[in-house]
A protein has these predicted regions:
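Mature extracytoplasmic domains of secretory-pathway proteins
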Residues: 49-86
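N-terminal domain-onset segments
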Residues: 1-64
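Glutamate identity and glutamate-enriched acidic tracts
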Residues: 5-8, 23, 32, 39, ...
């Protein structure tokens, strides 16, 4: 699989999980990894505080992803968070925010705004994507990587 195909596979897995959990009432931030055998592993915190800061979430995932990178040959990883973002009028709208990385040096932040109807069905909207810096994998000139 190409790096892009690996990222797309992991995105499909985590989006399905996020959508299902949102329809059941929501989810706490979670992570996922993909190994060379196309095996996805979920990383679920055992608990989370209701009003947690983004800095604490980032620090938590740095520790968890570092452990995952050290203990297995993962190629792709991501973190998934249910967020509220301001629209053009300043009204807060719900979204699924995903930070995804590939060990080859590719990283993206992706935001999927979503709507929820009266039957709790969640519909993901067109995502906004932005290339970003790696947060969890080491830089591409480090020869110690896979």
């Amino acid at each position: 699989m190409t790096p892009q195909e690996e990222k797309e596979l992991l995105l499909r897995v985590v989006l399905r999980i996020a959508q299902t959990q949102l329809e059941k009432g929501g989810f706490i931030p979670f992570g996922a990894t993909l190994g060379p055998g196309r095996e996805a592993q979920l990383l679920m915190p055992t608990s989370a505080k209701r009003e947690i800061t983004i800095d604490k979430v980032v620090a938590y995932w740095k520790v968890q992803m570092s452990k995952a990178i050290e203990t297995s040959k993962i190629t792709t990883l991501c973190t998934v968070t249910d967020v509220r973002i301001p629209d053009n009028d300043g009204k807060l709208i719900p979204g699924v925010f995903i930070h995804i990385e590939h060990w080859a040096g590719d990283a993206e932040d992706i935001l999927f705004p979503y709507t929820k109807d009266e039957n709790a069905k969640v519909t993901l909207q067109e995502p906004a994507k932005e290339a970003t810096n790696l947060q969890f994998f080491v830089t591409s000139d480090d020869s110690s990587r896979h």
